[in-house]
Amino acid sequence: MTKILFVCHGNICRSTMAEFYMKHIVDKAGLSDSIYVESAATSHEEIGNDTHYGTKKKLDEMGIPYNCRKARQVTVDDYHNFDYLIIMDENNGRNLKRIIGDDVDSKVFKAMSFVGESRDVKDPWYTGNFDETYDDVSRSCDALLELIKEKI
C-alpha cells in the first residue's frame, strides 16, 4: 500500500483539496486498495475545524466528493507511516522540518515538483482564488498518480 499525506498550513484549504481530489482520481483508477490518502497541517490554528467552505464549493463545482473531517496536525509518526509527504509551499517545508526533523528517507516533496515546477501552490485563504489552487492541485495530483502507477 502506497500512503500519501498532503500537508499545508491549516489543513482546511489546499491539503484537503488535494486529499479529496487524489482520493477521487485514485478511486476512478481502481486503485483504492493500493493507495491511501490523508492530509494534515503544520500549524495548530485550525485543528478540529472542517474543510474551508471555499474548498468545498470548488470541489462541488468540479464534482469531487468529500466528507466532513477535522483538521489535524502532522506528527513524527506520520513521517514514518507515509511514503509521500506532499507540501504546498516552502513555509510548509520549514515548519514540517521542525516537527519531523530531517527528511532522511527523502519522503518530502513540493506539490508542484511533480509537474516540473518549483513554485508554491498559492494559499486561497489569502488569495481567495480557489480556481487557481484547484488547477495546481489537480495537475500535481494527476502527475503524482502517474508516477505511483509506474511503481505499483
Q: Model regions: which residues?
A:
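Hydrophobic structural packing positions in well-ordered secondary structure
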Residues: C8, L59, I86-I87, V137
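Conserved active-site segments centered on acidic
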Residues: M1-H80, E146-I152
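Helix N-cap/beta->alpha junction signal
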Residues: S15, D89-E90
